[in-house]
Amino acid sequence: MRILLTNDDGVHAGGLAALERIARTLSDDVWIVAPETDQSGLAHSLSLSEPLRLRKISDKHFALRGTPTDCVIMGIRQVMDIKPDLVLSGVNSGSNVADDVTYSGTIAGAIEGTMQGVRSFALSQAYLYEDGARIVPWEVCETHAPALLEKLMVLDLPDGTFLNLNFPNCRPDEVDGAEVTMQGKLAFNLQVDARSDGRGFPYYWLKFGERAGAFIEGTDIHALKHNKISVTPLKLDLTDYSVTDRVARALGYGAQV
């Protein structure tokens, strides 16, 4: 089995190293095309206004000056001579749950793999802060992902569907199994931090504050809160079929879907 790995935290990220170790428990034909620099929050964006610079690090291991989406396209269309059987994107430093999936470059890697006709999974590891330092328990995903992926790889998923896997912030022996979930809802608490540079010119940082959520049973955020691995099937089709009739009636004609 041929596996293509990518991420959004960059080619030198600890999560990518963890993902490679996970992938090598499944296959010895593992390829990496990952961003040269951190591409977090760029979602499913393409580089259309500047060239893509590809750098070979070692055999089957490449860094690309581009987005996660660029990386998957280059991996499948340029770097690899034979299409991969599986695309794994991650392991992200931090969970990708609820509405955050729309921002995530990690999710985008799996989206692009799916669009290219390859079975794709996104993997993310929840973390905590201790004394101001980010502590990411990579051992959780490394312990539990291989067996989980072996089970999920044989699934007959519909076209346009991929899986979003989130691992809880706890010790490996505290993980309480895996749960199939739906997207939860977190309060939108994105803030703008206004600052001034040395010459008095303004600049800004975006940052997330504390985010409350309704930890409803069956959601991804509820699963993580209870030390469960969250497995959420996501799909490319964003159509809201529940309102097509109402929209059609508002326009004065029958539903078309």
Swiss-Prot record:
One of its GO terms (molecular function) is nucleotide binding. It is found in: Cytoplasm. Its main location: cytoplasm. Binds 1 divalent metal cation per subunit. InterPro entries: SurE, SurE-like_Pase/nucleotidase, SurE-like_sf. Its cofactor is a divalent metal cation. It comes from the Bacteria. A divalent metal cation binds at residues 8-9, 40, 92. Keywords: Cytoplasm, Hydrolase, Metal-binding, Nucleotide-binding. SUPFAM superfamilies: SurE-like (SSF64167). Its EC number is 3.1.3.5. It catalyses: a ribonucleoside 5'-phosphate + H2O = a ribonucleoside + phosphate. Gene3D superfamilies: Survival protein SurE-like phosphatase/nucleotidase. The keyword Transit peptide does not apply. It is an enzyme of class 3 (hydrolase). GO terms for cellular component: cytoplasm. PANTHER family: 5'-NUCLEOTIDASE SURE (PTHR30457), 5'_3'-NUCLEOTIDASE SURE (PTHR30457:SF12). HAMAP family: SurE. Nucleotidase that shows phosphatase activity on nucleoside 5'-monophosphates. Belongs to the SurE nucleotidase family. This is 5'-nucleotidase SurE. It comes from Rhizobium etli (strain ATCC 51251 / DSM 11541 / JCM 21823 / NBRC 15573 / CFN 42). The gene is surE.
